[in-house]
Each structure stands twice: as C-alpha cells, then as structure tokens.
Amino acid sequence: MKLKNMLMLAAAILTVFASVTVSSASDVGADGGPAFQTLERIETIVYGSPKGGGLLSRLNTAEKDVFGRELPGSLTERQTAMLDFLEKGTTTQPSLLFKLSVAEWAVSQQIHPEWSLARRIDTMETIVEGTVQGGALASRTERLITKLLPEGVLATPVEIPATTVVKTSLSQTLTVKNVKVDDKVVLKLVEEIVINNNLVAPKGSRVFAHITKVKPPRSFGRPSEIEMAFDALEVIGPNSVTVAMGEAAKKAMEADAATVGAVGASFAGAVLLGPLGLAGGFLVRGSDNHLKEGTLFYVETTSAANVHGYMIPSQISSMTVSGDVTAPQGTSSEINP
C-alpha cells in the first residue's frame, strides 16, 4: 500500500507538470510581477508567509521541502506545476491541500487552513505518531493518509444547494479602531457541512468577509457602527462558494438564542439587515466599540454550487454530525435530498 501511494504521488506530480503551458519570459521579472506573486502564494501555503531572496533559490527550497527534489523545466513551468499540485490536483488525484484537510479532519474532526502546510503536518504527526517525522511534506502527507485512511482519498463531485445555511464565528475581535473599510475579515465554520455523506467543508473551514462601513461613536449620543458584508465559504479543495446573509440565514440567526446572546453582549441594540438593506451583510450599532472574537453569524449560499467532497467511508461515518443544515438551527450539519 505504501509503494502504491508513492507511485500515485509520483504520477500526480508528473501529470500536473505535463499539463503546464509554457508562459512568456516576461512573466519572470524582478518587478513583483506574476512570477513573484505565484511564488509568494506557494510560500504562503507551505510556510505561512513569503520568503526573501531570489526566485530560483526560493523555488528550489520550496520544491525540496514539498517533493524532496527540484522539478525540471523553466521557472514558470515549475511554479505552475507546484501550485497546481498544491491547490488543483489532477483529473485522477485531488490536490495536496484537499488530502491534507481530509487527513486533518480524520484526526481531530476539524481543520486549520490558516496554518502553514508544514505546521499542519507537524501537528498531525505529533498526534498520530508521537513526534514530528522528517522528509518531504507530500510524502509525509501520504504516509499519514495510509495510516488513517488506508483506502486513500479521492474527490467526489457534489452540489451544494442554494440557501444552504451555515454557522460561523469571528476569528478575531473587531473594533471601530482596528478595522477600516475594505479590510478582510475571517470567520470559521462552527459545524461541518456534509452532503449525502460527502464531507464538503469541515469544522474550521474559513468564511471570508470584508468591512463596508466603520463609524465611531458620534456627538448627540449617536452610536458606533460596523458594517460587514460576507463573501465566500472556502470548502476543501480549496474552492470558494459565494455566501451572504440572506433571509434564511437571518431567520436562523434570530432563532438561535446563543447567537442573539453573543451579539447582544458585544453590541447593545444590534440591528440585522437582510440582503435588500445590506447586500447580504450585517450591521451592528451600539454604544460598545467592539465585536468580540467568537461572535456567531449565520450565512447562506447565494446559489447552487458544484464542488468536490470526500465520500466518508462507512466505518468512520459516525464521526459526522447528522441533520439538515438548511434549517434554522445551531446543531445539524448534513444535507440529504
């Protein structure tokens, strides 16, 4: 089984590399152009942040850390092949991030997409094997999968229905002093999304939003305001599905006493506006000037979306939470037709 997984890994690398189209030499510039942007994306995935130095030396290091060797080809070909391997995968094999998320979920029933690839693998090895193992990150991921999910990890096409309601929480405290218009906001999925026994988004998956208005407390007792619009849910893959605070999400939020309590504790007199009033966003007014980390929000998918999920084997299906995520609730998470 170990040899089979290694052969599949090697084939995936070669397939991704063979699919790369050659770009012009103008892409490889020292002016922060596409070549630098692609490499920074790779380094952010692998290490958590971009590194310093020349393009070639940085790419060589990343390839050795992920594959255990340097890939052949031009700089552009190698970068594209590596990014595809990390994020897209092939027609027969899901991406490394997809596999990693499934393995992480199998270990702890949640994922940490905000962590670097290296940290996520180190953490799983410590939990499963007692200590951090050496070697290429891709090989270490495959070894973990062999131990945790010996049948392997494949991606299954799944449709997420429109108005699928999901529960999220703020990853950081927002105040009228530490945010400004257009700032990105990250929330985390509180409950996993499972559709027809396919894991689509584990607990801990990210939901992205942005700040659309900030007003500090003003004269004559006028309250402070923070206005936030929701953008996308990141499912395993990683792919993004557009979300907003529509009517279904608003009803779920109003029905959940825990959510009402969390919001009320952060802002007195909070006001929820539906998609007509806020383009799918959320407005808070009150005398306090912060929205606490952990504050709960419901959002919903704006339309049906085709994504990929992981078909959960019957022997571990008990790890998932059963229910209907489209209902206004705070505990169920599975969609069945």
Please give the residue ranges for each predicted region.
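Bacterial N-terminal signal peptides that target proteins for export
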Residues: 1-10
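Low-complexity, Gly/Pro
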Residues: 2, 24-26, 337
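Short, linear, compositionally biased motifs with a strong N-terminal bias
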Residues: 12-13, 264
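Alpha-helical transmembrane segments
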Residues: 14-17, 277
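C-terminal segment of classical bacterial N-terminal signal peptides
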Residues: 16-24
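Alpha-helical, heptad-rich or low-complexity scaffold/stalk segments
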Residues: 26-146
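Contiguous beta-sheet cores, especially beta-hairpins with glycine/small-residue-rich turns
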Residues: 154-330, 334-337
